[in-house]
């Protein structure tokens, strides 16, 4: 139980940390102050550090420990070079994030061995990108409270990207839910949609409504 919890935490923390920097594409340095980059790059380093500590403390495979450590070292180097800089290359930040994505894919396939690797990677990237997008949009929204005349287009682009990811996730969830079958107490096989219309499936229907829709 503890091992599975650690896997979930590492999976979530690492996925968030490696996908978060890609949202910088919606906030170019020319339109926002360096403090925004400092804070968010530092946040990624902190979350990535937590993933590394958990990986090491729970004695996961050394390849994962070294992989996360290598990515984190690269990210911290990029953070050092970009700190308070007037010329920040989003390409460089994205390269470090791409390296992290490769590490994340290897980790995801290893801790979720049962199933199609492509589906695992797709689901993981979409889910973690949504989490990263929500936090990024929240921080960006708070930035508007402290910075005068910050272009609203930055938040609009971020919100549009997040909405796009949410639509993809919703469609994917509905497709997966449609393929689910349930055998009721009478031995009758029902589709998930049929099951939630029964009295026994009422609470599942509530969960679907709030969780998917």
Residue ranges, per PLM feature:
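Hydrophobic cores of alpha-helical transmembrane segments in multi-pass integral membrane proteins
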Residues: 3-109, 124-143, 160-178, 182, ...
């Amino acid at each position: 139980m503890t091992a599975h919890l650690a896997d979930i935490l590492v999976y979530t923390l690492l996925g968030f940390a490696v996908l978060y920097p890609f949202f910088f594409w919606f906030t170019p340095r020319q339109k926002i102050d360096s403090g925004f980059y400092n804070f968010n790059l530092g946040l990624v380093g902190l979350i990535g550090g937590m993933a590394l500590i958990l990986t090491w403390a729970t004695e996961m495979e050394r390849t994962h420990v070294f992989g996360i450590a290598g990515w984190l070292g690269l990210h911290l180097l990029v953070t050092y070079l970009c700190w308070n800089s007037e010329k920040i290359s989003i390409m460089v930040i994205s390269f470090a994030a791409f390296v992290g994505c490769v590490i994340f894919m290897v980790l995801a396939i290893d801790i979720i061995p049962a199933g199609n690797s492509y589906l695992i990677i797709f689901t993981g990237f979409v889910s973690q990108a949504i989490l990263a997008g929500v936090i990024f949009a929240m921080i960006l929204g708070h930035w508007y409270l402290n910075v005068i005349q910050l272009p609203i287009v930055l938040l609009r682009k971020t919100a549009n990207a997040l909405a796009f990811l949410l639509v993809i996730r919703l469609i994917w969830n509905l497709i997966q839910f449609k393929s689910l079958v349930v055998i009721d107490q009478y031995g009758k096989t029902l589709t998930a949609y049929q099951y939630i219309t029964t009295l026994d499936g009422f609470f599942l229907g509530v969960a679907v409504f709030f969780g998917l829709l």
